[in-house]
Amino acid sequence: VDIDDISMLQVGRWPWPRPVLAALINRIAEGHPEALAIDILFAEVSARPNDDQLLRTALQNAARQGTRIILAVGKEEGTNNYLPLYPLDVIAAGNTLGHITFHTGRDGLVRGLYMEEGHLPAMSWALVDRTAQSNRNETLNMLLERRWDVHDSMLLGALKELPPTISAAALLRGDVSPDQLKGRKVLLGSTAIGSGDFFVSPLEDAQPRRISGLELHAVAAEAQIIHHFKQPLSAPLQGSIEVLVVLLTMLLLYRTSPFLG
């Protein structure tokens, strides 16, 4: 479910007030999806405290109808380490938490993610696998030791096309029935300009292009569902390949040198 540019034009600019997001979540819940992962940070208190309670009520309503809720945990640079940006307790209570971090390679492209960062499962993993859980106490202990642990690097295989998308505005207006979401694993976020993170990635149709964080989470979830991922090279093998490339380049330059007879 995409809060796209059209949704922004019709409903209002970003960030949307939490009562509007609550109405959207209620609308999604009418379709009884199996799980709903929300790629939106709720780390700050709303200007109107009752708005946070409205959002909590919408999440509780969805959970009562059998939908698993996964909320985003962001990350910011600390003095000596990373600091997780948790949702407000009033919003996070009772819900699964997942990290939303992607890392760029040396060439500036995103090709995968860590399945676990800071004792938090990747949001896409938590969406696909109900056994993926966060451990806030372990995260706190890690931060006290000034560490940010990452585990299980996963390289994603490119998809021919992205998973299907529904415009948030169309869902709110009633142009699209929430029944389309029945039993599905749903991601809610935004691809609108100025609303979130954007990356360059070859994960759609194997061609590097600008892609939103929401779309990357969708690719990661789909790749896990269909087991379409690659095994990353081990550090020693990666280093050996880089050395070999350097040696071959030096050999080529030597053989083509004009100073050789």
Positions of the model-derived regions?
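Substrate-access "cap/lid" subdomains that shape
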Residues: Q133-V176
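Non-transmembrane functional regions of envelope-associated proteins
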Residues: D2-E145, L181-G261
